[in-house]
Structures are given as structure tokens and as C-alpha cells.
């Protein structure tokens, strides 16, 4: 009897362990199927970013009211009907000018804003306040230390603002989104002083950085960029804007820390897809060294020629396969290594492989 009981207990133990292991691997497998996308939308001189995960749509900023048609066209192309959370990083019109129009056209369930607001109100703020009130939308105010939920298992940590300022840019919400082993840092329009203050408080290391203030010369401090150490940098900026964004020296500085630099004025909308382990990037266009623009290239890769590095036969510069400045196909030469490219007299592109 004792022998039978011992055997029965052994079988039960094996069964429990087997079920636990199978459940564990099933959970991992299901997690890998849950892809997250982050799209930095081309809205001209402004900023708008769409996060999609588990059927939820989270919109960070909306761009200018005058550029709203670009945002709406993109949202409709993604079959967006409702927005679970519209986050307004700060009150500049190039970040929230279209917010009331988003509420008009889509079912917005929540609006998140910074806890600290400057006293001065512009026309867009008044329109947004009215739209929130008229549609009885829930609101949330966040500051450093707050959390913003995207969906089950994924949230954003808020790093700023930590105190009130009379300057809108300094009140920008700074957030870090984590999805498995991948991370994104959103910076609004913060300046170098706030960037350096964040360095003292947080681990900023991220895979993707939305460059602060459209690449303004008042942001992107060296120390900050070195701590973020982003493989990908994205500049939300409008072509021919009157502010000179992005500053040339900022772009060069980014090249010291990022492998790939994307600009919405040249690359159009930039979309990252994360499975929790890997990141894929897709752009609307590829901006080329020779001034040509290749439309709808799909995912940027070197598959056509089988090489990891892509050279421009006209400039004798070679790029990484995901660079945002690849030449058009007829001007490409493929290489298996940087050394291979250099043996043919090519030099590395400073913003992607020439680090």
C-alpha cells in the first residue's frame, strides 16, 4: 500500500511539474505574439506618435491644427476608431493644436496632461478644455514618478515634470516605454538643463530616442545622449521650417551615439515594431545622399543584394542596412563587412556606422 502511495505521489509530482513547464512556455509563446508598434507620424513641424498594443491605441501629441489632415489620414489608414489615451506632452500648438479635432473624429476615452501647467492659455488649450468638458472625457494629470498604462503588462514611467515652470517646454512630460527588452524614450520639448537633471535621477538607457524639441540646439546635451545611448534616434520635424530644426551640430552629435538617425521631414512616418526582443523599423521614404527620394521602400534592409552594408557608388560612402540615408537601388553596392567596403575605397557614414 505504501509502495502504491509513493508511486502515486511520484506520478502526481511529475504531472504538476509538466503542467507548470507547459504553462510557462505557453505564456512565453503568447507574449512573443503580442507585438507593439510605435509610429512617429509625419505631421510637418510638430509631433504626433501612435502606440498600438493589444488592440489599444495611445496617441502622444497631435501636431498643429493646420497639419491635422496628415494625422487623420494616418490614423484612418491604421483603422483607428477609438483612442484609449491621448497624452498631451505640453501646451505648444505644434504638439496639441489638433487635440480637439481628434476628440471630434475619434472616441477618446482619456486625456493625460502634465500636472504642472503654465498660467498662460492659448486658443488651442481653450478648445481642448471645451472638447474634454463637452464630451465628458476622463482626465489624468501626471508628474515625475507617475505611471501611464498602455495595456495589460505594458506601461510608461514618467520622469518629468518634477516641478512647475512658466515655460511650456519645461513642463513637457518625459516618458519611458518598456516592452520586454525594448524601450522608447519620449522627451517632448525639454531643454538641456532638464535633460541633465534627468541623468542624475534615472536610468535613461533606451533603444529608441525621440530627440527633444525637434532637434533644437537648446536640447540634446552630450551627457544626456551618452546616458540614453539609443541605437535609433528619431527627429520629428518639418521640411524647411523657419526655426532651422534640426540644428546641424545636433545631428552630428547624435551620430556619435546612435547607429541610425531618422527624420520625419526626410523619411516620412517612422514605425517601429517590437516583439519584446527584436525591433524592426519601416519608413515611408528613404532619403538618399544624392538628393533623391525613394517612395514606399518598406522595411529598410540589404536583402536585395545580400550584403549587410550598402555603399553609394557616387559618394563612395557605405551605410548600415537600416540607415535612413540609403542611396536608390541603381546607385547601391553591397558589402558583407565594413572592412570589405573600405577595401574598395568606401568610407563609413558617420551617422550609422562611422562611430
Residues covered by each model-derived region:
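A short, charged, amphipathic alpha-helix used as a generic interaction element across diverse proteins
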Residues: 336-348
Amino acid at each position: 500500500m505504501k509502495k502504491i502511495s509513493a508511486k502515486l505521489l511520484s506520478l502526481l509530482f511529475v504531472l504538476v511539474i509538466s503542467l507548470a513547464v507547459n504553462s510557462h512556455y505557453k505564456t512565453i509563446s503568447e507574449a512573443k505574439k503580442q507585438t507593439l508598434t510605435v509610429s512617429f507620424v509625419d505631421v510637418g513641424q510638430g509631433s504626433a506618435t501612435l502606440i498600438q498594443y493589444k488592440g489599444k491605441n495611445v496617441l502622444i501629441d497631435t501636431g498643429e491644427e493646420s497639419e491635422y489632415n496628415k494625422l487623420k489620414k494616418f490614423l484612418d489608414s491604421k483603422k483607428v476608431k477609438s483612442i484609449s489615451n491621448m497624452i498631451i506632452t505640453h501646451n505648444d500648438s505644434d504638439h496639441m493644436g489638433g487635440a480637439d479635432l481628434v476628440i471630434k473624429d475619434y472616441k477618446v476615452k482619456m486625456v493625460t496632461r502634465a500636472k504642472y501647467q503654465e498660467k498662460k492659455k492659448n486658443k488651442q488649450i481653450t478648445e481642448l478644455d471645451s472638447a474634454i468638458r463637452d464630451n465628458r472625457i476622463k482626465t489624468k494629470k501626471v508628474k515625475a514618478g507617475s505611471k501611464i498604462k498602455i495595456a495589460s503588462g505594458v506601461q510608461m514611467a514618467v520622469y518629468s515634470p518634477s516641478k512647475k515652470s512658466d515655460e511650456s517646454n519645461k513642463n513637457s512630460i518625459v516618458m519611458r516605454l518598456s516592452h520586454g527588452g525594448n524601450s522608447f524614450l519620449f522627451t517632448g520639448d525639454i531643454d538641456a538643463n532638464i535633460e541633465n537633471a534627468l541623468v542624475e535621477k534615472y536610468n535613461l538607457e533606451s533603444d529608441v530616442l525621440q530627440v527633444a524639441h525637434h532637434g533644437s540646439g537648446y536640447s540634446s546635451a552630450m551627457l544626456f545622449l551618452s546616458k540614453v545611448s539609443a541605437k535609433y534616434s528619431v527627429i520629428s520635424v518639418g521640411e524647411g521650417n523657419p526655426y532651422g530644426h534640426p540644428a546641424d551640430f545636433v545631428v552630428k552629435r547624435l551620430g556619435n551615439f546612435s547607429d541610425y538617425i531618422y527624420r520625419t521631414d526626410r523619411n516620412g512616418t517612422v514605425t517601429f515594431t517590437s516583439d519584446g526582443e527584436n525591433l524592426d523599423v519601416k519608413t515611408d521614404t528613404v532619403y538618399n545622399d544624392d538628393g533623391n527620394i525613394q517612395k514606399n521602400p518598406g522595411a529598410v534592409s540589404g536583402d536585395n543584394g545580400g550584403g549587410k552594408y550598402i555603399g553609394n557608388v557616387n559618394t563612395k560612402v557605405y551605410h548600415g542596412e537600416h540607415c535612413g540615408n540609403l542611396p536608390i537601388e541603381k546607385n547601391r553596392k553591397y558589402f558583407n563587412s565594413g572592412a570589405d567596403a573600405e577595401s574598395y575605397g568606401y568610407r563609413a557614414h558617420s551617422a550609422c556606422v562611422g562611430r
